[in-house]
């Protein structure tokens, strides 16, 4: 069952000001904006890493001020820029992190890892014992995606996960992510409009700690909002 997420008039110092946002179960939402706009802060509030100075954050209707944050994080998949792999653990040990916390036995974990990695064009037998330092950037990020998705989390939080990769690998991983997302609720931070249009059905434009625009992805490119036009024009030039 996919999760719902809600920010209710949250503020944090000068970073966010009275931000409200609702994400419905199964919805995919991209937070887009310039660097320093407050996108990542909003994302980190959704699993309790950052606590607002005022306002409330709810996941599945439960305030994070009183929620069991450890349990919440175990059922939340998170993908960050640079993969965030444990450098001294093998590929399999990294992928098995959440299943072990959830009490899965090794046979179930191995089968799930084998199935998921095969969908990502990674042979389980070839990669399971390798260390992160022996992998390319794209391979590391594939392992990071597998670790986040192996337990089919109801909520996926993604913080510019493909930003450091070359364009070809980036597009491949975007397509892999879309294919594997299942029915999870997704909040995806990016400053790349083409990426936002690929992975999300709704785009929220964040500017200087406030929500400047919230619309369906298909409507964003036609918006007359000045900052939205800058993103559209930049994407057109890059293309």
What do these predicted ranges mean?
Residues 208-209:
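Conserved ABC ATPase "signature" C-loop
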Residues 63-77, 101, 182, 220-223:
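ABC ATPase NBD coupling module
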Residues 47:
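Helix-to-loop junction immediately C-terminal to a conserved catalytic motif
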Residues 170-182:
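Helical segment within the ABC ATPase nucleotide-binding domain
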Residues 131-135, 139:
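Conserved ABC ATPase signature
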Residues 156-159:
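Catalytic Walker B motif of ABC-type/P-loop ATPase nucleotide-binding domains
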Residues 196-198:
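A short, surface-exposed alpha-helical micro-motif characterized by mixed small hydrophobic
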